[in-house]
From Swiss-Prot:
UniProt record, GO biological process: proteolysis involved in protein catabolic process
Key words of the record: Allosteric enzyme, Cytoplasm, Hydrolase, Metal-binding, Protease, Sodium, Threonine protease
Native organism taxonomy: Bacteria, Pseudomonadati, Pseudomonadota, Gammaproteobacteria, Cellvibrionales
Subcellular location(s) per record: Cytoplasm
Natural source organism: Teredinibacter turnerae (strain ATCC 39867 / T7901)
Summary of activators and inhibitors of this protein: Allosterically activated by HslU binding.
Top-level EC class: hydrolase
Role description: Protease subunit of a proteasome-like degradation complex believed to be a general protein degrading machinery.
Family in the record: Belongs to the peptidase T1B family. HslV subfamily.
Domain of life: Bacteria
Sequence positions that bind Na(+): 162, 165, 168
Name by which UniProt lists this protein: ATP-dependent protease subunit HslV
A GO molecular-function annotation: threonine-type endopeptidase activity
Amino acid sequence: MEQYRGTTILSIRRGNQVVIGGDGQVSLGNTIMKGNARKVRRLYKNQVIAGFAGGTADAFTLFERFEAKLESHGGQLVRAAVELAKDWRTDRALRRLEALLAVADKEASLIITGNGDVIQPEDDLIAIGSGGAFAQSAARALLDNTELSAREIVQKGLTIAGDICIYTNHNQTIEELEY
């Protein structure tokens, strides 16, 4: 059975802000099933922000598991991410889940993959999903050549991705943390 998929998630850390934003489109094959999905949310007492790309049902399962890991590890983002990645890699049921998570708190920005990888990207710039390469290119140019805030860069990067990627729309959800 074909999965619901396609999205763009972009995260930027600049100054005393970290921002994660995502579009709202859910596609099944070449059909838009929903245009206002919420793929970015706050977790663990509003201290962590997270976004997902990939299968929608899979991502919600992973959000629940990740939040449980955050609870059991006192909100320690890196430790919770590593523990989730271990489970994701070794648990038979979880291993079939197809999604990527972008997570951030006041100290770190991470990508968690189903291969068991926990990646802290260069420059604290994360771009995942079908429009990720477009959003990343736009964000990198804006980071290097402007003084825009993290939120403004996320908004512009997602807009550019939505202009180019057929699986990304302009209905944006953006969450930010200040520290």
